[in-house]
Swiss-Prot record:
Gene3D superfamilies: NAD(P)-binding Rossmann-like Domain
GO biological process, one term: import into nucleus
Protein family (similarity comment): Belongs to the FMP52 family.
Official protein name in the record: Protein fmp52-2, mitochondrial
UniProt organism field: Aspergillus oryzae (strain ATCC 42149 / RIB 40) (Yellow koji mold)
Subcellular location: Mitochondrion outer membrane
First and last residues of the transit peptide: 1-45
Disulfide bonds: none
Keyword list, A-Z: Membrane, Mitochondrion, Mitochondrion outer membrane, Transit peptide
GO cellular component term of the entry, any: mitochondrial outer membrane
Membrane topology: Peripheral membrane protein
Amino acid sequence: MTTAAVFGSTGAVGGQILATLLASDAFSSVKTVSRRLPNAQSPKLQTLEEGDITKWGGLIASLSPKPSIVFNAVGTTRAAAGGIANQWKIDHDLCIENAKAAKEAGVKTYVFISSGGTRGFFSRYVPYSKMKIGVEDAIKELDFEQAIILRPGLILQREKPKAALLENIVQNLNKLGQGVQDMIGQDQTVIGRAAVAAARMAEEGKAPSKYWVLEQADIVRLGRDEWKQ
């Protein structure tokens, strides 16, 4: 049985990761670290509420039993953070600090929810893309026993859409064919399931590489087409 910890469990994808972990018999214990407690409840769930995000990384070593897998689904927007500088502190600095703390604590598998399109020629100069690239590169350099990076497209079916009009347009693209929508956006549940499925494969020694990047097609395949509870 496996123990996992989730950062960002109150967000769209993080919440789906948490729900999937709690529903899976493969995980005996699930921990969360967040500024506010998640709504989920389960006998195997242990929640830690910490308003000071600079303390999050240090809490990993205090978790018992120690998680073998850590999921990082932390993310915010420029508007919610109050500017690009504050967003950088969360989407870049905090994520790297948590990854370093996980490595020091002996975590075997680290799963990071990044974003699709960040490595494009023009997008790499966009601040948001630079944040994600910085975190991805830092995780790779930390040399975890297994690192998994998910690069989803537009996140769909969120309870509180961040770009309601755009998300609604992409959501309706399935009328032209599911494959059309899949190239642009993925359901939050599918992304969460893909993250857990990939982590389970890594635990079973079935990951295709030590540093495994899942693009949008991979996310759809693992989180929907091949998904098994």
